Design a protein with these regions (language model features):
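Substrate-binding cleft of carbohydrate-active enzyme catalytic domains
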Residues: 1-70
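Contiguous hydrophobic segments
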Residues: 4, 9-16, 25, 179-183, ...
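Catalytic-core regions of glycoside hydrolase
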Residues: 44-188
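C-terminal functional modules
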Residues: 191-277
């Protein structure tokens, strides 16, 4: 079953949020037949204060009241431990927000970091209990919008055991069709629902030569034998005819340029692309 959730970002441009304008937009998508909506308060530049928590709760309550047929979700302005200046359970914004929400509104959470590799399910459960709303993990493991042209192709195994006590897990993919099909299979395998193992999935979707340079695609990548890796990258670029190659072009060309020219890009490689020599 597929549930289409439409996202709206009120407050992204202006600190004040016009409820009438917001409701008009919601009515427009509701008229199109969309019955699930997520209010996105993430990435707002204004400080996440206690007052902002109150305002965001009032907006959610008004939307829930005016559109009872719509299933409502929220990405709070603080959506990760990393973004909170205090322990999350003591965060003034979050406590004010969730204490004032009068309806059941599941919220998205990215874990300890905005881009998390794994999750402490016991801790996640405590956050869920603290705020008395269902929690959905927003997983950025495979995401690339913040580090283009970097591509992550790695084993997805963020849970020690099946996360039964949370509402769900949503992965944030890349928007590249063939690559996302591969990543969805890796996600399914990591959740214990796939029939193929990691290597079988890779062989089905990637040129054979790619397997030998996967260290550049790991979540925590590394630089290998530069001369040998340049040769392999050239083979993938010029000899492979698989459709997914087009979606990997930007990263492969970037790697080829950096490895061949060896500029002083330590900050870019380490901090931006997570590649350590």
């Amino acid at each position: 079953n597929i549930e289409l959730i439409f996202g709206i970002s009120p407050g992204f441009v202006s600190e004040s949020i016009d409820q009438t304008t917001l409701n008009n937009k919601i009515q427009a998508i509701f008229d199109l037949g969309i019955k699930s909506l997520c209010i996105l308060f993430d990435d707002i530049s204004f400080e996440a204060t206690k007052q902002k928590g109150k305002e965001h709760a009032e907006i959610l309550n008004k939307v829930s009241q005016d559109f009872p047929e719509i299933k409502l979700y929220i990405v709070p302005q603080i959506y990760s431990d990393q973004l909170s200046k205090t322990d999350v359970k003591d965060c003034l914004y979050l406590n004010e927000l969730f204490s004032r929400i009068k309806y059941k509104v599941p919220f998205f959470w990215t874990g300890e970091n905005v881009v998390s590799k794994s999750y402490d399910l016991e801790y996640i459960s405590k956050i869920q209990e603290r705020f008395n709303q269902e929690l959905i993990i927003w997983d950025n493991f495979f995401a690339s919008d913040y580090c283009e042209p970097r591509v992550t192709i790695d084993v997805y195994n963020p849970f020690v055991k099946n996360p039964k006590n949370i509402c769900g897990v949503m992965i944030n993919p890349t928007g590249k069709v063939n690559l996302d099909i591969l990543l969805l299979e890796l996600f399914s395998f990591g959740m214990g629902k796939g029939n193929e193992d990691f290597k079988s999935i890779l062989k089905k979707h990637l040129p054979n030569e790619m397997i030998d340079i996967l260290h550049y695609f790991k979540f925590e990548g590394r630089i290998g034998d530069v001369d040998k890796d340049i040769e392999i990258i050239d083979k993938v670029l010029w000899n492979s005819s698989m459709e997914i190659k087009i979606e990997l072009y930007p990263y492969l060309h970037f790697l080829r340029f950096v490895l061949k020219n060896k500029p002083d890009l330590k900050y870019l490689l380490d901090k931006r692309l997570r590649l350590k020599s």
